Amino acid sequence: EEAWLAMRDEGEIHDLLLDECLHGISGTDSKPGIMKNGVVKAGVTPLQHKLLHCVGTVAKEANLPIFCHHDPKVQSGYDILNVYASAGVEPNRVILGHTGDCNDWAYQEDLVKAGAYIGFDRLAYGHLDNPVKNSVKNIVELVSKGYINRIFLSHDWATYLAFWDSWDKTVSQDYLNLDIDFTYIS
């Protein structure tokens, strides 16, 4: 929970984000092509609700899609979509990231049936939360049901990092070593 955001009301955050979407980020002419949120393992807390609603409102006004990180093990995707809907955002404008981290095929199907996109976006280290073979099985099942256009396959940038090791190992890795192919799914 971010103190800077907790201290500000939704209107103030909204105005800052909308200005950056319409006029440029931090005084530049660079504008976002997508909005982004994240929901913690605790699910949609009061602060998360405020931020989801705010980002949803800005995304609607600026005509931007939304990517939202979430923890599918607590099934917060339902609440996330409901908050976005209360801000006027249709589910087909939302990607729920990390949905493939769980092996709950019914949950994944519910989200795509609702119209959202889902991310199987951490496949390279799926062994930590959900074995890759389970994710592949769920992807095949979803594709066989006609949801191929609702699934984002990737592996999060974190797959390049030694997240599960020490910081020293992380910063000492050579990410520009072209002899290492980080684009595999095992």
Identify the role of each PLM range:
Residues 62-65, 85-92, 112-119, 147-149:
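Glycine-enriched alpha-helix->loop->beta-strand junction motifs that scaffold or abut catalytic
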Residues 49-54, 132-139, 169-172:
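Charged helix-capping and loop-helix junction motifs
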Residues 96-102, 121-141:
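Active-site glycine- and acidic-residue-rich loops that bind
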Residues 46-50, 73-87, 105-113:
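Distinct, well-ordered alpha-helical segments
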Residues 1-60, 117, 124:
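Active-site gating/metal-coordination segments in enzymes
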Residues 65-72, 93-100:
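Catalytic beta/alpha-barrel core
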